[in-house]
């Protein structure tokens, strides 16, 4: 959640953020009213409790003849105290509810607007020029017997697939290359749970308006769409030592997404699916270091795409396209020849202290005082990379030139049937 002090003391900052997101500003006033109601309820309860304490002392020192009347008054006062406590709890619940509904405050650096207002920061690599009509990744995958969508649909339904033979080997090679890069960069590897408790999913900001995008089991547990969720909850209710710098993890997991809002989009191939693999970077840092850490995460993603010899561009995502938890987000988009356009293959988000406040993840400074850490995340490798690899490295006969960095992992220079 956002810092309550910012909401109370400088509400215009939150109003501007809501405006940039294209969302209602009325929730700011609703939350401020709820806050005032809470303060009133607290004051009322504390006043009655003080009266109760005074009356208790009076009863203790009273004459026997006065005690029955004092006890009658005490019973009435006890009922008022009970009601006041309930009103305070109700007011606090309403305040917390509204506070949880407000998305993170958008960075002042994030562009205004929707998708077409995203700012391209840079473009890297040469777009391949083919002397033939480039095939799409599914055609290439089927020719190589590497991707089997039809049997995926038969077994599990639409947007499912099998990776087979070279397809499976290629994904594992990509993941291992990313893992090697992560370990050499000092990240700690985690293999994370893919089922999490509701409070962890809520804490990361994936419920509320995004609840329709995640799978919920009858038990109440949720399937995660990214290991970010599990890693964010890994240190919940803890005080971390970040005096030596950021705490960085790389979490591998299968990921599950309903893609509820994607009807009719990317129905061909494995660009947008319900299950995929991902290696996610996640950092806990001092809030003042979050901007620098975001740049570090993006630099790691760029290294990975450069190793895979994929042309890409980095875009600063417009405010209306940001998720609930993100204050700022960069997308790295790969060139997809069959579509003659750039498509997002990985992203990096600065969530500032938003998730840490919800999950109670703190640090202790040199004076002994605690504060909330900032959390950041970014994908280092995912199944979607296969789309870019197959299409950008295809040859006229349908074989795939293996990027040099993957050759030791695959044991050959070309993938062919």
UniProtKB/Swiss-Prot annotation:
Protein biosynthesis as UniProt keyword: yes
Biological-process GO terms, alphabetical: selenocysteine biosynthetic process; seryl-tRNA aminoacylation
Chief localization: cytoplasm
UniProt GO MF annotations: ATP binding; serine-tRNA ligase activity
Reaction catalyzed: tRNA(Ser) + L-serine + ATP = L-seryl-tRNA(Ser) + AMP + diphosphate + H(+); tRNA(Sec) + L-serine + ATP = L-seryl-tRNA(Sec) + AMP + diphosphate + H(+)
Pathway the protein acts in: Aminoacyl-tRNA biosynthesis; selenocysteinyl-tRNA(Sec) biosynthesis; L-seryl-tRNA(Sec) from L-serine and tRNA(Sec): step 1/1
EC numbers: 6.1.1.11
Cellular component GO terms held in the UniProt record: cytoplasm
Compartmental location: Cytoplasm
Sorted UniProt keywords: Aminoacyl-tRNA synthetase, ATP-binding, Cytoplasm, Ligase, Nucleotide-binding, Protein biosynthesis
Domain of life: Bacteria
Residues the entry annotates as binding L-serine: 226-228, 280, 379
Residue numbers binding ATP: 257-259, 273, 344-347
Keyword Ligase annotated: yes
PROSITE patterns, per database record: AA_TRNA_LIGASE_II (PS50862)
EC class name: ligase
Record's signal peptide: none
Similarity comment text for this entry: Belongs to the class-II aminoacyl-tRNA synthetase family. Type-1 seryl-tRNA synthetase subfamily.
Summary of the function given for this chain in its UniProt record: Catalyzes the attachment of serine to tRNA(Ser). Is also able to aminoacylate tRNA(Sec) with serine, to form the misacylated tRNA L-seryl-tRNA(Sec), which will be further converted into selenocysteinyl-tRNA(Sec).
Domain characteristics, as noted in the entry: Consists of two distinct domains, a catalytic core and a N-terminal extension that is involved in tRNA binding.
NCBIfam families reported in the protein's UniProt record: serS
Subunit text: Homodimer. The tRNA molecule binds across the dimer.
Name listed for the protein in its UniProt record: Serine--tRNA ligase
Source organism (scientific name): Tropheryma whipplei (strain Twist)
């Amino acid at each position: 959640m956002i810092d309550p002090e910012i909401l109370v003391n400088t509400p215009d900052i939150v109003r501007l953020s809501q405006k940039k997101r294209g969302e209602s500003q009325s929730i700011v006033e609703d939350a401020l009213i709820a806050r005032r109601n809470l303060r009133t309820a607290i004051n009322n309860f504390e006043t009655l409790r003080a009266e109760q304490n005074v009356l208790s002392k009076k009863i203790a020192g009273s004459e026997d003849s006065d005690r029955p009347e004092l006890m009658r008054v005490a019973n009435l006062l006890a009922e008022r105290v009970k009601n006041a406590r309930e009103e305070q709890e109700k007011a606090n619940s309403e305040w917390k509810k509204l506070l949880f509904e407000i998305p993170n405050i958008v960075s002042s650096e994030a562009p205004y607007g929707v998708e077409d207002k995203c700012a391209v920061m840079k473009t890297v690599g040469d777009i391949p020029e083919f002397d033939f009509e480039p095939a799409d990744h599914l055609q290439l995958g089927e020719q190589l017997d590497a991707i089997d969508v039809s049997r995926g649909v038969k077994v599990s339904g639409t947007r499912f697939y099998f990776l087979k033979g070279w397809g499976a080997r290629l994904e594992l090679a990509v993941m291992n290359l990313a893992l090697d890069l992560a370990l050499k960069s000092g990240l700690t590897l985690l293999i994370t749970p893919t089922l999490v408790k509701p409070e962890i999913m809520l804490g990361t900001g994936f419920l509320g308006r995004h609840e329709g995008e995640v799978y919920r089991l009858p038990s109440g547990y949720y399937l995660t769409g990214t290991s970010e969720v599990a890693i964010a909850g890994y240190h919940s209710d803890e005080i971390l030592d970040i005096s030596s710098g950021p705490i960085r993890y790389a979490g591998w997991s299968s990921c599950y997404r309903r893609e509820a809002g994607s009807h009719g989009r990317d129905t061909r191939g494995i660009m947008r699916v319900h299950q995929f693999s991902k290696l996610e970077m996640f950092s806990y840092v001092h809030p003042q270091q979050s901007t620098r850490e975001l740049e570090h995460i993006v630099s790691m993603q760029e290294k990975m795409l450069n190793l895979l010899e994929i042309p890409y561009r980095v875009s600063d995502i417009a405010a209306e396209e940001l998720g609930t938890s993100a204050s700022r987000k960069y997308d790295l988009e790969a060139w997809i020849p069959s579509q003659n356009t750039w498509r997002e293959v990985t992203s990096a988000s600065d969530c500032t202290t938003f998730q840490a406040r919800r999950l109670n993840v703190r640090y202790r400074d040199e004076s002994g005082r605690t504060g909330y850490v900032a959390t950041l995340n970014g994908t280092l490798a995912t199944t979607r990379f296969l789309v870019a690899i197959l299409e950008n490295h295809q040859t006229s006969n349908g074989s795939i030139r293996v990027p040099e960095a993957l050759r030791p992992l695959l044991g050959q220079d070309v993938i062919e049937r």
